[in-house]
Amino acid sequence: MLNSAMSVVILAAGKGTRMYSDIPKVLHTLAGKPMVQHVIDAATKLGAAQVHLVYGHGGELLKQTLKDDKLNWVLQAEQLGTGHAMQKAAPFFSDDEDILMLYGDVPLISVETLQRLRDAKPQGGIGLLTVKLDDPSGYGRITRENGKVTGIVEHKDATDEQRQIQEINTGILIANGADLKRWLSKLTNNNAQGEYYITDIIALAYQEGREIAAVYPARISETDGVNNRLQLSRLERIYQAEQAEKLLLSGVMLRDPARFDLRGTLHCGMDVEIDANVIIEGYVTLGHRVKIGAGCIIKNSVIGDDCEISPYSVVEDAHLEAACTIGPFARLRPGAELLAGAHVGNFVEMKKARLGKGSKAGHLTYLGDAEIGDNVNIGAGTITCNYDGANKFKTVIGDDVFVGSDTQLVAPVTVGKGATIAAGTTVTRNVADNELVLSRVPQVHKQGWQRPVKKK
């Protein structure tokens, strides 16, 4: 069916006392981003014309964190219930648009479920998302008459017969803007809590003869809310299990799906293998036949075909061409670039540095602000000294250079093609092509040398 224009209201004003945190509840992260951002993303993908975010506790931190110019911020200074929150947003509703109500602490709601809810909303009626639970204790029950939804009864107000009902209210609903504003204006707070409940509009709509259509989510976990860290950790595992399942079914080999975390977006080629305890963050692309070892962290990086990242390496904002090998225990920081066949070994760190085709930095090395040519050997313990305490400077190393162990290159400095830097050298001046450079204290031999002994 053809959907009307739609705006979304996200309720995010609660403090989240049971989180025991100074951070607003909806800013606690799931899969690397705030819970409320998951909900905003779903609303955006659904095609919302406007997203109204109802906020209260920690509003300034919310604005600093989300930084979304498209959000309409609606202040609920005093939290007097879900109906009160919607009343605050109501002045922004257009009469001819549908309004979808979501929650900032229900992060797993899917676009597919919301689209089915949107499609099911009757003309002039309400679309309501409900679920059936084996143990519905504490939840508002959905009452029906001849199969039609007639209202929602809170658990504390329900009769013994009504408490046997397993269908409960999730709080997620959609209705026309004009109808919603009218029903919201009729809400009262004549209850023990002195709050305005959005659930009361169901009975108001039924009294007007409006149809209420109930829709079930694809998975019950989509409607699970978060009130404490235990619930958040459970949703994290549910989310990660779903992501792992999708990857496995698409051909990615996860050696232990229960110990894999995806905190962003991952694109994989054919025959990719990922070992246990790997974390993927941001936007990551893995080419064909890439192997990621145990305990690695890959963030916002492109890894070319046939690359192998050995265990416990960290790769962030880096670009690797085909057939590169990394680690174990290597760190590629932002701006690291490896050309085809390059190798970075254990305890090597790179930042804003390019390592040419077939070049190697095998052990215990720092390469920062450096441009290194093809077929270069960087010996163990080499350091590009790029910082003078105030400014950064660049080191340039040409093709086919051999850099011996324990070398310091004090930038700015250029080493020409084919040059050889002897072990233990400190390079402070440019080196010409094919030169040998060495700077060492002369080696002294003392025959019959006696070591000092401790005095008794």
UniProtKB/Swiss-Prot annotation:
Signal peptide: none
Record key words, sorted: Acyltransferase, Cell shape, Cell wall biogenesis/degradation, Cytoplasm, Magnesium, Metal-binding, Multifunctional enzyme, Nucleotidyltransferase, Peptidoglycan synthesis, Repeat, Transferase
Segments for region (Linker): 230-250
Superkingdom per UniProt: Bacteria
Active-site annotation: 363
Region feature N-acetyltransferase, mapped onto this chain: 251-456
CDD domains per the UniProt record, alphabetical: GT2_GlmU_N_bac, LbH_GlmU_C
Pathway: Nucleotide-sugar biosynthesis; UDP-N-acetyl-alpha-D-glucosamine biosynthesis; N-acetyl-alpha-D-glucosamine 1-phosphate from alpha-D-glucosamine 6-phosphate (route II): step 2/2; Nucleotide-sugar biosynthesis; UDP-N-acetyl-alpha-D-glucosamine biosynthesis; UDP-N-acetyl-alpha-D-glucosamine from N-acetyl-alpha-D-glucosamine 1-phosphate: step 1/1; Bacterial outer membrane biogenesis; LPS lipid A biosynthesis
Binding site for UDP-N-acetyl-alpha-D-glucosamine: 11-14, 25, 76, 81-82, 103-105, 140, 154, 169, 227, 333, 351, 366, 377
HAMAP family (UniProt xref): GlmU
Record text on subunit structure and interactions: Homotrimer.
NCBIfam families reported in the protein's UniProt record: glmU, PRK09451.1
Protein name: Bifunctional protein GlmU
Organism: Salmonella gallinarum (strain 287/91 / NCTC 13346)
Upper lineage: Bacteria, Pseudomonadati, Pseudomonadota, Gammaproteobacteria, Enterobacterales
